[in-house]
């Protein structure tokens, strides 16, 4: 970890648009659609809004509750009771009730803070989902481009094998090659054609995956065909400590930990008495014309103090439950941090190793191409049979495909590294507790 490079100001990526580092307009356009049209992100955004409303609900408990009910009751007493009865009466009521629970011990305030911190965690989870789907799209895109590279390679190979088939056919017609040479060349050509056709399946699957990530029907998207034209650009890594502020999943677990801590305080408040104030006032009359009049008024007001005398250990268990839940969030936070460091280190190593592997594979392709040229020359001179040519052709194609695959893996690893670093996200993007409570 200590070997990470210190990020310089010029290293910074455009905030929120880390994919622009690849300088690919088509990728840029697809990435822009993820935030707008991805249905999983729409669900995560709705969950964040739900969490914000939960904050408002918790905050409403800080204020009195006022209710009013208008009623008209027509009643007749039983004529067989000992008490005077049998008469019929109508009662008109318009009571207004006010109830208020004083937050003496801060339990309601803690509930508001816990809900707000949970909403912050929900926002961080939304941003983590956004980063995850953006990275998934970029990986699918480069896998598709890698498939395009293999297709282009096989198309060139098919043309080359057609020329070799013509060469063996001409030599057979001139009596200097056997029919086996022609059959082998034809088999080699047919195999390459089959491989080329098979790549269409993989390409279609990557195209369908991109369509779904951008909120489209799988068959409705068509991505132009061209191979990867760049090598992985340098990714600004920075210092390990900065990772704690750059990953939204770390921010989410930290906020969950804060919310769980507030729940411990809420559980402890149950040990103290609850003070509430009740007020009832309104108008009541048995005569409609006198209902809305000053003499019909009534009111009652008074405080109430409630304390649990015995609960068989319920409150103690609730505190223990809240403490255990908090301990779980602490462990989850630590594990998330460790996993984040691992992901960064894994992809840094992958990029370094794959770069060396790419250089070695390029040398192998050059050597295989030279070997094929020599075998072809020797075959034309009649010093070797066609099997030697086929062997060198297979080695060259294998090395060329491997070179394309390594480049694809390098691009994918660079995307995974950016994702592991949190993209362009920063903890400063979290909404404040006040903003969450006010719905901004």
Locate the predicted segments by residue.
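Short flexible linkers and secondary-structure junctions
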Residues: 1-138, 274-279, 312-319
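Outer-membrane beta-barrel pore domains and translocons
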Residues: 69-75, 99, 125, 147, ...
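Short sequence motifs at beta-strands and strand-loop junctions characteristic
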Residues: 86-90, 295-297, 398
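Periplasmic alpha-helical coiled-coil/stalk elements that build and connect Gram-negative outer-membrane
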Residues: 108, 124-239, 350, 354, ...
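Hydrophobic, lipid-facing positions within transmembrane beta-strands of outer-membrane proteins
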Residues: 92-98, 140, 239, 299-305
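A short glycine-centered flexible hinge/capping loop motif at secondary-structure junctions
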Residues: 172-176, 379-383, 420-424
């Amino acid at each position: 970890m200590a070997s990470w490079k210190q990020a310089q100001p010029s290293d910074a990526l455009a905030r929120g648009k880390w994919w622009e580092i690849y300088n690919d307009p088509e990728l840029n356009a697809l990435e822009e659609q993820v935030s707008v049209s991805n249905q999983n992100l729409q669900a995560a955004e709705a969950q964040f809004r739900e969490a914000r409303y939960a904050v408002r609900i918790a905050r409403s408990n800080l204020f009195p509750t006022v209710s009013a009910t208008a009623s008209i009751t027509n009643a007749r007493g039983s004529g067989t009771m000992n008490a005077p009865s049998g008469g019929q009466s109508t009662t008109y009521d318009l009571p207004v009730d006010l109830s208020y629970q004083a937050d003496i011990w801060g339990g309601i305030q803690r509930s508001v803070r816990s809900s707000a911190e949970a909403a912050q965690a929900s926002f961080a989870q939304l941003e983590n989902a956004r980063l995850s789907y953006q990275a998934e799209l970029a990986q699918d895109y480069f896998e598709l481009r890698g498939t395009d590279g293999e297709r282009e390679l096989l198309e060139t190979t098919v043309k080359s094998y057609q020329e070799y088939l013509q060469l063996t056919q001409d030599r057979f017609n001139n009596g200097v090659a056997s029919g086996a040479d022609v059959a082998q060349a034809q088999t080699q050509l047919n195999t390459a054609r089959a491989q080329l056709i098979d790549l269409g399946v993989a390409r279609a699957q990557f195209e369908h995956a991109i369509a779904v990530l951008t909120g489209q029907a799988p068959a409705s998207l068509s991505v132009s065909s061209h191979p990867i034209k760049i090598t992985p650009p340098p990714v600004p890594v920075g210092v390990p400590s900065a990772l704690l502020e750059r990953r939204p999943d770390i921010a989410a677990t930290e906020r969950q930990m804060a919310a769980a801590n507030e729940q411990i305080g809420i559980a402890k408040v149950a040990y103290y008495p609850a003070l509430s104030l009740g007020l009832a006032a309104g108008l009541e009359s048995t005569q409609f014309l006198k209902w809305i009049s000053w003499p019909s008024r009534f009111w009652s007001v008074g405080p109430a103090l409630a304390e649990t005398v015995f609960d068989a250990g319920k409150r103690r268990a609730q505190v223990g439950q809240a403490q255990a839940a908090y301990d779980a969030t602490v462990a989850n936070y630590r594990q998330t941090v460790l996993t984040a460091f691992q992901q960064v280190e894994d992809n840094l190593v992958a990029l370094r190793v794959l770069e060396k592997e790419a250089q070695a594979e390029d040398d192998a392709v050059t050597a295989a191409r030279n070997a094929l040229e020599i075998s072809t020359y020797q075959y034309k001179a009649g010093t070797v049979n066609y099997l030697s040519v086929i062997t060198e052709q297979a080695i060259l194609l294998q090395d060329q495909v491997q070179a394309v695959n390594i480049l694809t893996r390098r691009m994918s690893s660079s995307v995974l590294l950016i994702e592991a670093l949190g993209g362009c996200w920063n903890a400063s993007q979290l909404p404040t507790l006040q903003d969450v409570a006010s719905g901004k």
